[in-house]
Amino acid sequence: MNPMLHAVRAAAVAVVLASAPLGARAATEAKPYNIVFVLVDDLRFDTMGFLTPGLQTPNIDFLARNGVYFPNAVVCSSLCSPSRATILTGMTTRNHGVVDNNNSSEKGLEFFPQYLREAGYQTAFVGKWHMGEASDAPRPGFDYWVSFRGQGSYFPTDGLLPQQVAAGARQMLNVNGQEVPQKGYITDELTDYAMQWLEHGRDATKPFFLYLSHKAVHSEAKPPQRYELQYADLDIKLPASMANTEENNRGKPMWVRNQRNSWHGADFF
């Protein structure tokens, strides 16, 4: 285990136990905690209501008010797949080997939900996996599985030709190894699958771990119709460094300049 993580966890447990009555400690130690882990894709660090006035994220704001916020947290990589692999393995990119979004392999890696499952937890994964390849097949360590290939689609007909849509074709989800047509906006649908499992698909006598991995707000972001005009009147100021100008490029080698137009960080190597 990461020494820092171990120290933080030990300190947290110590605070809880120190403040608990003696009679309650045995019960506290005996009952495992349920865990819900929510991952949002490509969300800027400050695009939450409690950090930026005008943004409407009431549920995230509630968690910030009633939980712990880590203002100095960083990811091990600014790329999608390497970051996901680090979350699931606790390893740095050079150790787990998932170094890009398209050509890496997760073969031989072990994920922490496997250990939770061995410890008696019911485990569920719902959402975007995308860890170096496009497969949506169920992965080890999960009792319940809902995913899609690669980046997935915001809407069921995204990426399909008009004649395909007319013929009834839809983007597909993998639900416990079976192909199921996507029915609606992906954020809503993934949330519905997660809630269905929490309320009806598990054994309520056992602890659970739910990993809800949303596609949104990955570029090119497409909001559902009900939110299309939500920020129409909000004045959003873009950072000066965002512009692809001579001033921003001055003194930078070409490979650095090219990364400004890169989807996966290595498109020009």
Sequence positions of predicted segments:
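Bacterial N-terminal signal peptides that target proteins for export
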Residues: 1-12, 20-22
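Formylglycine-dependent sulfatase
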Residues: 13, 17, 24-269
